[in-house]
Amino acid sequence: VSLCKRRGFIFQSAEIYGGLNGCWDYGPMGVELKRNLKEYWWRKNVQEREDVVGMDGSILTHNSVLVASGHVGGFSDPMCDCLLTKERLRADQVPAQSGMGFFYTGAAKKDGSWNIEKKYSVLVESEKQADKARKTAAQYYAQLAGKDASYKDMELKGECMETVTDSTMYNPANGSLLTEAREFNLMFKTTIGATSDENDPNATGWLRPETAQSIFCQYKNILDSSRVKLTFGIAQIGKSFRNEINPRNFTFRSREFEQMEIEYFCRPEDGLRLVDEWLEHRLCFYDEVGVPREHIHILDVPDGERA
């Protein structure tokens, strides 16, 4: 990342104000690199092919479009929060853990300055780590009380121990109890119109989570207005947005990103043959832009795991 910044390829968005996590600004070198890649992709996949046409769809997306596609109801991840650090984790990625659970009903400062009645628990490897569990619990209750205190300065109430087996209710990093899982929508929602009601579905809009939906919506118009017929494709390059919980891996997992996409329409009986043809076409393209095919892993996704 530091090399890309020094050479003028990419910078953290709003860096002088602390940075906007998951968003990046491309500098003089980066914007030229992107432009070259997009122009080459468009030339190879649209201009040099007779079976692919292009379009440029709106970023703002009608609520009904994403209701119909299943995004409004299902484009979400189950999330839970660490009660101690407030870190947000994917609930379905928390590993099952076993060990000794220390359970508490509350805590109070020994001098009587505060008292909290709230259940909490900590998971440690064994009873021998009792001090670690108590310290974690003390940190949790001290946060609730708004005070900086150690377990030596407070009384932990109702302590009991119990063997815990294959539980996904604890943060693997520190043993703290997690909140119950809840669904977290991964799309950016907005309201359309100056006097719009955010609870009115007709005034609700979204920043598109992918470019595919506008292609599907305009399929009939493109079919009627262009000299195309099955089998053919529609290509699009454009921005998409996803409210990633934990943006990571540099630009790979970001909240705003650019896609180059082709939706290819064919008769069912031609599908498998065309997949093989397009696979070879893509491998040749990547090789041309400097990614040798021996560096690419081709994964055959089983039917039950496909989106």
Residue ranges and their predicted role:
Residues 1-307:
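TRNA-recognition modules of translation machinery and tRNA-sensing kinases, especially anticodon-binding
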